């Protein structure tokens, strides 16, 4: 990455806000009661040609918090088995998962001289709701994300590609969707990031 291009492209593109793509996989729809099971965060950068690209992805499997609800329909939808032996070996607590991801985000904020992160997600309010609920549960004091503002790729993809469902938007954009990897936080976050970068790059000339 060209550091000068990166700073110019990221620091000022969104008024000092750093877009970070987040996807969560959960055991339900209620962030106050339902378990957070996976979280992935995709960091973005600007290449030597001035295009927005994926920089790095951080992902964690998460142990359900004590007393968390595990909705069977949600588990069947995602295919996640919370008590699978392999998953139990690699999963971490909500607090550790968030601390690990927030540490990387803070490094990116310093690197790009941005004042705060802004969450990018497909149905972003859902992801931000679970992140904020986990932050409150774990007592983490420094949440790098704006508390309510987001970039939602549902809206962006509806405008750019005429599709609002993630898989259909990815196909419409010509990025290729693999159903076998769907509902993995890592895969969904990276595909969301690819869509976001494509939309931003299409509008680059208007903001250069």
Outline where the language-model segments fall.
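Short, glycine/acidic-enriched loop or turn micro-motifs at the edges of active sites
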Residues: 26-28, 155, 191
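Acidic active-site catalytic centers that drive phospho-/nucleotidyl reactions
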Residues: 23-25, 127, 152, 188
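Acidic, Mg2+-coordinating catalytic module of metal-dependent nucleases/exonucleases
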Residues: 118-125, 129-130, 134-135, 167-208
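Conserved non-catalytic scaffold segment of RNase H-like nuclease domains
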Residues: 2-122
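Short, polar/flexible loop-turn hinges at active-site or ligand-entry regions and domain interfaces
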Residues: 82-90, 138-144, 177-179
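Histidine/lysine/aspartate-rich catalytic loop segments that bind and position anionic ligands
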Residues: 135-140, 144-159
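Active-site-proximal helix-loop-helix substrate-binding element of RNase H-like nuclease domains
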Residues: 62-78, 82-85, 153-189
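Conserved protein kinase catalytic core
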Residues: 29-31, 158, 194
